[in-house]
């Protein structure tokens, strides 16, 4: 299996201005990344009468247990006043051993 650099992946994800409800391409990016790692992927759209449709990425690796489930989200709330940030929220930066970004 291909190795992944978690810090670089986090930086790549932060670069997407995926402000709710726009995903800015981050879901497609992550789907391609996971597919290259051997995951079977599928985008599922959930919708009902009271909410706008929401896309979800479902990814599975293998078919035997034990199983591990990760549930997260790819969108963020607006960053607010950019003058309040010490860095551009969508240009990740490592400072003093900490990754800073939105």
Regions of interest found by a model, annotated:
Residues 1, 7-8, 36-41:
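Pyridoxal 5′-phosphate
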Residues 1-4, 87-89:
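Short hydrophobic/aromatic-rich motifs at helix boundaries and adjacent loops
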Residues 7-9, 23, 75:
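Acidic active-site catalytic centers that drive phospho-/nucleotidyl reactions
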Residues 7-17:
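Generic N-terminal amphipathic, Lys/Arg-enriched alpha-helix
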Residues 14, 26-27, 76-77:
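Hydrophobic aliphatic residue packing
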Residues 18, 45-46, 72, 101:
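Short glycine-centered, acidic/aromatic-flanked micro-motifs in structured strand/loop junctions
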Residues 19-66, 86-93:
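A non-catalytic alpha/beta surface segment that caps or lines the substrate-entry region
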Residues 67-102:
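Active-site metal-coordination/substrate-binding segment of hydrolases
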